[in-house]
């Protein structure tokens, strides 16, 4: 297994966990204090449940870009689309910053390490793919 694949697989696995978390929020799990800055402790209201589903979908798209860039799935990124790998890097970097500044201590404890793993692995794929 090459370095690019070795970086992409943890990204995909971690994103699956985050997607599961988002879908659990959408289904009513009482974990609102660990998302969205802790603004909705307990169960998300209806509009935030919809937002959680949208976030899960976007995370799936970001994971597909990383995995395709590493030729783990699809193997569809022709040279003209190679720049797409920088989108997950930017999204992951933004997640690190937002999770560092969140007012929710629980959210910081959980999601800063997760977003750092996503940033490191997506950056490694971007630099080696």
PLM feature segments, named:
Residues 61-98:
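Mid-chain, well-packed structural core segment of small domains
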Residues 68-72, 122-129:
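Juxtamembrane boundary at the C-terminal end of a transmembrane helix
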Residues 7, 11-18, 48-58, 84-91, ...:
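Hydrophobic alpha-helical transmembrane segments of polytopic
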Residues 4-8, 38-39, 75-83, 106-115:
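Non-cytosolic membrane-interface motifs at loop->transmembrane helix junctions
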Residues 13-33:
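N-terminal signal-anchor/start-transfer transmembrane helix
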Residues 94-110, 126-129:
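Membrane-helix boundary connector in multi-pass membrane proteins
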Residues 54-67, 119-123:
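Hydrophobic core of alpha-helical transmembrane segments in multi-pass integral membrane proteins
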Residues 2-8, 28-52, 73:
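Interfacial loop at the N-terminal end of multi-pass membrane proteins
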């Amino acid at each position: 297994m090459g370095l690019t694949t070795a970086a992409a697989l943890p990204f995909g696995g971690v994103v699956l966990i985050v997607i599961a978390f988002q879908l659990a929020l959408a289904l009513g799990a009482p974990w609102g204090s660990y998302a969205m800055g802790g603004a909705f402790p307990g169960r998300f209201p209806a509009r935030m449940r919809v937002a959680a589903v949208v976030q899960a979908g976007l995370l799936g798209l970001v994971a597909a870009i990383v995995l395709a860039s590493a030729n783990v799935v699809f193997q569809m990124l022709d040279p003209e689309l190679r720049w797409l790998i920088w989108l997950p890097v930017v999204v992951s970097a933004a997640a690190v910053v937002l999770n560092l500044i969140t007012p929710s201590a629980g959210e910081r404890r959980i999601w800063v390490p997760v977003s750092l793993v996503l940033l490191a692995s997506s950056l490694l794929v971007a630099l080696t793919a």
